[in-house]
Amino acid sequence: MRGDKETTNWLNKSLMKQARQKKLSIIAVGVLSTVAVTVGYLLYLYRGQRNPNIRDVKPKSKCYVLTQDLFDKIENWQEELSKDSVMLVLPEVAHLGNHLKLQLSSIEHKIVIFNNSSAVWSAVRHLKKYELVISRDKTSDMPVDLRRYVGQISHI
């Protein structure tokens, strides 16, 4: 009987040792995974600092909300719209938008004429251009949440 007890003790110790080794291997895999993920993330951050953001390299995109004031102040619409920009024409100055479309036929696709003002603001939200260029007298009509969709608002 004594032999059976010793065998049972030995068997229990052996099973406990295997369970301990299994736990240690699971912990080791977890630690190694955490270290690998951390190193990968740090490399990602380091490479991001070395390579400038694409948004910093390319010219800033612009969205113009056309009013009579804005039309009068900018002299060369050909140059302004040839960059990464678009012009949204308010209903009250649709005639100016049509005039510009005739003058600038090569970039007329960048001039969008709207029938109502709320559609203009919706388009500004969806375009998500970096800069919104707008006349000072139209800022009161501008929705409050618009600042979330553009990087900067310039008043002319």
UniProtKB/Swiss-Prot annotation:
- Report the main location listed first in the record: membrane
Which key words are in the record? Membrane, Peroxisome, Peroxisome biogenesis, Transmembrane, Transmembrane helix
The answer to whether UniProt assigns keyword Manganese to this entry is: no
User: Any transmembrane segments, and where?
Assistant: 24-46
Provide GO CC annotations from the record: peroxisomal membrane
Q: What's the domain of life for this entry?
A: Eukaryota
Indicate how the chain sits in the lipid bilayer: Single-pass membrane protein
What would be one Pfam family of this protein? Peroxin-22
Q: Where in the cell is it found?
A: Peroxisome membrane
Signal peptide stretch: none
What InterPro entries does the annotation carry? Peroxin-22, Peroxin-22_C_sf
Q: Biological process GO annotation list?
A: peroxisome organization
Briefly state the protein's biological role.
Answer: Involved in peroxisome biogenesis.
Family of the protein in this entry: Belongs to the peroxin-22 family.
Please identify the protein, giving its name as recorded.
Answer: Peroxisome assembly protein 22
Tell me what organism the protein belongs to.
Kluyveromyces lactis (strain ATCC 8585 / CBS 2359 / DSM 70799 / NBRC 1267 / NRRL Y-1140 / WM37)
The beginning of the lineage is: Eukaryota, Fungi, Dikarya, Ascomycota, Saccharomycotina
Q: Which gene encodes it?
A: PEX22
